Amino acid sequence: MKISVLASDLSDNATGRADLLARLLSSRYEVDVVGPQFGEGLWAPSRDGPVAYRSVRAGRDPGFARHVPELLALVDGEILVASKPRPTSFGLGLLARARRRRPLVLDIDDWEVGFFYRSGAWGRVGRALNLANPNGLPWTWLAEKLICRADAITVASRFLERRFGGTLLPHVRDTEAWDPARYDRADARARQGVGASKVVMFLGTPRGHKGVDDLIDAVGLLGPGVVLALVGVDPARSGAPRWSGLSHVRMTGEIPFDDVPRYLVAADVVAVPQRETMDTVGQVPAKLFDAMALARPIVSTSVSMIPEILDGCGLVVEPGDVPALAGAIKRLLDNTEEAAALGQRARERCEARYSFRVARATLFPLLERLTARSR
């Protein structure tokens, strides 16, 4: 049986969750990921991986509609899994199901409408009038109103579960493949040119709500001998030129997802300093689970589900509190035994709750029930 995973834009980091869903499903089903590509090329971390992608190059303008028939022709699975309640993924799924009846699962890993609230009242007015963007506020709001049309819903956080219902399916990692014993820490440190310095690492797309500026300031308070490695930074992004000029910051560009362990094992501490905003209220950073799988000591913030996930296996501080963030990082850098114990407990938690095995035990029965009902 084939499953089509529908992604909203294969050129940006929204591809990450679609890629994860495809990897989870591929042990039992034939799977590919289908979606529009609004930018240049497939999102870099997903290139050259095991997931099959089929895309249509499109623009964020009224002309997008003419590409819909091309996209629908690619949606040939017996089951449809739409990643995110956006018009260009879930909306496409609704159209595909209308053409040929088949189960449609909607996976929600962010509160998409919440992203538009960060701009304030006048910003929302401007975005509400932007009818040209197929994933703009008016159409995303409409897609959210149609969530009840899905045959099943999976959600990545408690906030999303309360708001939309459905089955909790957090971000997970392949803890068998991501065994820290398989990766050479000395080689990882040499690759990033950190010498004998202690390494605090942030891995991922460094957007404002992810607290990267807070982290840069916090590590700057720790003095010489500690460097901040930012891995996955597009050098053209806002902020990147300024960060690269700081003596305590090392920057690495976007890397393939399957290379993440080869970089992350270099970290003495992994920091996930989410800010508390409308962007993050429903979000759980996927990179948290990278660090957990690889037994890295973690410092994060009390946003969304993070305190629940890291309870007893990581340090959590208030969001936006730079001195507290610096203090928690320093504590782990100075107390290596505590750091190692927390890292090991984080891996054990990941294996028990946030592994491919656990996610498949949730996802596969859900799909089996749907296909049984549709026969």
Mark where each language-model region is.
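Acidic anion/phosphate-binding donor-loop and adjacent secondary structure
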Residues: R173-R191, G239-P241, R373
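Nucleotide-activated donor-binding/catalytic signature segment of Leloir-type glycosyltransferases, i.e.
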Residues: S238-L264
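Conserved acidic donor-binding segment of nucleotide-sugar-dependent glycosyltransferases
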Residues: G312-V322, R331-E337
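Nucleotide-sugar-dependent
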Residues: K210, P256-Y263, D268-M292, S300-E308
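Glycosyltransferase donor-sugar binding loop
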Residues: P36-G39, R173, L203, V227-A240
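A short, well-ordered alpha-helix in the C-terminal region of glycosyltransferases
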Residues: A190, R331, E338-R353
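Carbohydrate-associated surface elements
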Residues: F159, V172
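Conserved donor-binding/catalytic core segment of Leloir-type glycosyltransferases
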Residues: S4-L6, G193-K210, I216-G220, A229
